[in-house]
């Protein structure tokens, strides 16, 4: 009799364990079904599901206000999730069956590379917008998404795998109804950490940031360079002769300007980036111009020509020497950047860039009034009166 009771107890224990295991398996299957359904919708580019987990504003939380978004913006998430994939590694259901945790492996785009490309393109747009005096806001939500759209359409990014945990809760009463708990970490994981990278103020280093500034400068036209570098006295003019000189100088920049970064020093939110700048040799241009001008002013023609013609001929000589120049010079120039908590930014860029690129030609050496040359003498142009580069660092 005792033996029979023991067997009955043992069988009941086995049955209870089996039932528990079965229930646990059912619970895990239910949880897995919810996860699979939701993530498959992401894979299939269901816009409602995308917006459910990633709101437009959450990628760029610093942008204030809302705006209607174009079809190109809608397309960003379709392009982003086209290679999205996942694998459920483990599911753990709580004993009270009210919560569950799932561990997954997600396959997403290399969002660090995407974010660095975005930061580069966004900075380029901001620089050119400032140089053009454009009314368009490069920091608007739509402008930012249009950059992402262009990058995702025109560039190929590798896929990377990351581990992700997901929390679920049972919202049912009579029957189990599992629901994925939306959190910042989950949203960030679903987009491969893009939210973290886009908010990283150090994603572009000071050296990389300066590289964007200098490369963008190479692409500027006459008006953009004039506005951006703040040298309107030389480049921004309605005078036809001076306009020709300004255009020739910009052409010299396009043909000769280059740079090499030799090192950097970062102290907290301040950085110094040392470079070797190569540009046209303004000193050679001025020396040749001054010699030819002296020869002309000492000639009888200068007296006969009168003040206005002497002025016009001086401009012609300067233009000729700029256009014919093939001499370059390489000089060390230090640039200073500050991290404002959003990104690294070049400080006093107009002053440091204009002096580094144009040297002594940051202002015209041609005197407006040539009356002082009536007796054949000349008023020497002094480099001491020219723009002096300020090598002083920011104050600590």
Task: Mark where each language-model region is.
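Charged, low-complexity helical/coil segments in non-catalytic cytosolic or luminal regions
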Residues: 217-224, 268, 281, 293, ...
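Core segments of small alpha/beta cavity-forming domains
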Residues: 25-79, 83, 191-261, 284-286
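Hydrophobic helical h-region of N-terminal Sec-dependent signal peptides
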Residues: 9-17
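Fold-core signature of tandem repeat domains
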Residues: 54, 86-88, 168, 259-261, ...
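Surface-exposed, charged secondary-structure patches
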Residues: 71-151, 245-321, 375-396
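Short beta-strand edge/turn micro-motifs at domain boundaries
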Residues: 113, 120-201, 295-309, 323-374
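C-terminal motif of bacterial Sec signal peptides marking the signal peptidase cleavage site
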Residues: 19-22
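Bacterial N-terminal signal peptides that target proteins for export
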Residues: 1-10
């Amino acid at each position: 009799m005792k033996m029979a009771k023991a067997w009955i107890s043992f069988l009941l224990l086995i049955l209870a364990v089996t039932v528990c295991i079965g229930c646990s398996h059912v619970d895990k299957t239910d949880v897995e079904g919810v996860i699979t359904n939701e993530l498959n919708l992401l894979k299939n580019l269901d816009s409602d599901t995308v917006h459910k987990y990633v709101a437009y504003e959450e990628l760029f939380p610093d942008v204030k206000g809302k705006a209607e978004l174009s079809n190109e913006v809608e397309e960003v998430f379709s392009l982003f999730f086209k290679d999205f994939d996942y694998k459920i590694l483990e599911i753990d259901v709580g004993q009270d069956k009210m919560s569950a945790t799932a561990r997954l492996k997600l396959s997403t785009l290399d969002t660090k590379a995407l974010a660095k490309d975005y930061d580069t393109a966004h900075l380029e747009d901001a620089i050119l917008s400032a140089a053009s005096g454009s009314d368009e806001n490069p920091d608007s939500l739509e402008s930012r998404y249009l950059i992402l759209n262009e990058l995702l359409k025109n560039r190929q990014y590798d896929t990377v795998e990351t581990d992700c945990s997901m929390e679920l809760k049972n919202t049912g009463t009579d029957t189990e109804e599992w629901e994925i708990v939306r959190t910042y970490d989950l949203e960030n994981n679903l987009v491969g950490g893009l939210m973290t990278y886009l908010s990283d103020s150090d994603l572009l280093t000071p050296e990389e940031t300066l590289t964007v500034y200098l490369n963008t400068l190479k692409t500027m036209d006459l008006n953009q360079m004039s506005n951006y570098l703040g040298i309107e006295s030389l480049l921004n003019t309605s005078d036809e002769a001076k306009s020709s000189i300004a255009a020739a100088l910009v052409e010299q920049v396009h043909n000769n300007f280059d740079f090499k970064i030799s090192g950097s020093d970062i102290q907290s939110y301040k950085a110094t980036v040392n470079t070797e700048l190569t540009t046209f040799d303004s000193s050679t241009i001025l020396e040749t111009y001054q010699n030819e001008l002296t020869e002309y002013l000492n000639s009888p023609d200068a007296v006969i020509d009168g003040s206005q013609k002497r002025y016009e001929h001086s401009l012609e000589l300067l233009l000729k020497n700029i256009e014919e120049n093939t001499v370059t010079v390489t000089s060390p120039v230090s640039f200073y950047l500050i991290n404002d908590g959003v990104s690294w930014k070049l400080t006093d860029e107009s002053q440091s860039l204009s002096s580094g690129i144009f040297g002594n030609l940051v202002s015209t050496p041609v005197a407006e009034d040539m009356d002082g040359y009536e007796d054949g003498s000349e008023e020497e142009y002094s480099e001491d009166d020219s723009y002096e580069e300020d090598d002083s660092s920011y104050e600590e």
